[in-house]
Amino acid sequence: MSTTSESILQKRIKRFKSIKRGYYSLLLIIFLYIISLLGPLWINNKPLVLKYDNKYYFPAIIDLLDFIPGINYPLYESKTFNQKSNKIEVDFRQLKKEISKEDNGNFILMPIYPYHPHEDLKDQLDEEYEDLNGNQVYDFGEPFIDENRDGKWNENHPPTLPAGFRGRHLLGTDNTGRDVFVRIVDGYKISITFAIIVTVLSYIIGIAIGACLGYFAGKLDLFGVRLMEIFSAVPFLFTLMILASFMQPNVLLLATMSVLLQGWIGITYYIRGEFFREKAKDYVSAAVSMGTSPSNIMFKHILPNSLTPVITFAPFSIIGNIFTLVSLDFLGYGLRPPTSSWGNLLSQAAENLDNWHMLIFPIIVLTLTIFMITFISEAIREAFDPKIYSRLR
């Protein structure tokens, strides 16, 4: 009977899974991120499937590919669907009502939550009412959905309070009439995407530079450390704000600036120190004596033994990057409206403190996200603790 021993990495992964709080937090973060990436399929003002005059359209599915550059997205004009409107683009929610009244073979399937993160609903926020006498005007006594709960039927009244599952907007709308729930979900996608991009790029650059400085040392290390000291002295957030004020930043541009300005420095210091420690050990001397190339020694021998500190640091880096984006957006130097972001929601809330829902819900989601990432970092730190699986005791 043969037995296979587990590697240290397998033991660490097994240990991480045994820490339920961190493991389930990781699963939940990943699940919510996937759900947010698939947002166009369930939070969108465009239909999943539309059959009109024996032609089929799939607008929401096309929206799912909006991150691919170079794709020409079709404009669905109101006249194509015989919709009388002063707007060029068709109102699919209104089209659904029109199709439901007809019996001509047309068909439309809207997403579960039919609102778009960038959609301005200010001219569509009339509280719904039951037009009993069919005069197209609200008359006293007709039943209505009291979204702002003031006991009166209202027109065009953003921001609206949360209507729960009884009304149209689960968490209400902001001061521009955009749905808060939709913008929180889209903001989650943008925040996590930004944090992941910055963290991954910072790690790639930091590991490469730190490995070279720690392994080759000498004048290269002296020059590299002086360069890092110069970059460290630069006020990161203020510099980013100045650069952002001269351009129209998107997620990728902001992430790139964050990495180049300071994101790579902390990882470089960690890896440099680990390489200094590891290259003095016998297995490195043995590899050198066997004629192994420096690149193989650095990235196949030393690097795998140097990653523990930076792996445990990764979740904290993600938290820091999320707060960087939130801070920039809150101050007005980040992503430009109508792009959804938690910082932009909080900035709107600061101007509308009497509308509690605009402040409470983004803060709750941001806090829960930070807590879950913190649980993940604690679990990783405990699972990758070198004392647990050390052979030298």
Where are these regions (language model features)?
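Gly/Trp-centered helix-boundary motif
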Residues: 1-203, 207, 212, 338, ...
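Alpha-helical transmembrane segments of integral membrane proteins
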Residues: 173-393
